[in-house]
Curated annotation (Swiss-Prot):
Disulfide bonds join C24-C54, C32-C58, C41-C53, C42-C80, C47-C62. Residues 21-66 form the WAP domain. Contains 5 disulfide bonds. Residues 1-20 form the signal peptide. One of its GO terms (cellular component) is extracellular region. GO terms for biological process: defense response to bacterium. It is found in: Secreted. This is U15-lycotoxin-Ls1e. Coiled coil: none annotated.
Length: 86
């Protein structure tokens, strides 16, 4: 009996992990002029309200995660600066 309960709980835990995958949304923009590239964030801590720092061709922006893959999170790092990137 205990092993059946354990198996059900384990299955529920695995399903919740699989179903909770979150991604940065895919950008609809494929290119951006260099003078328009701007970073609003460099890491997730720069964003508020549960949004993530996501990379786009026009810079890094805070976006709410989605369940569809395609976008990418900003790499951040010491060289990342907020504001316009020239």
């Amino acid at each position: 009996m205990n092993s059946k309960i354990f198996a059900v709980l384990l299955l529920l835990a695995l399903l919740s992990c699989v179903l909770s995958d979150q991604y940065c949304p895919k950008s609809s923009i494929t290119a951006c002029k260099k003078m328009n590239i701007r970073n609003d964030c460099c890491k997730d801590d720069d964003c508020t309200g549960g949004s993530w720092c996501c990379a786009t061709p026009c810079g890094n922006f805070c976006k709410y995660p989605t369940d569809r893959p395609g976008g990418r999170r900003a790499a951040g790092g010491k060289s990342c600066k907020t504001g316009y990137v020239y």
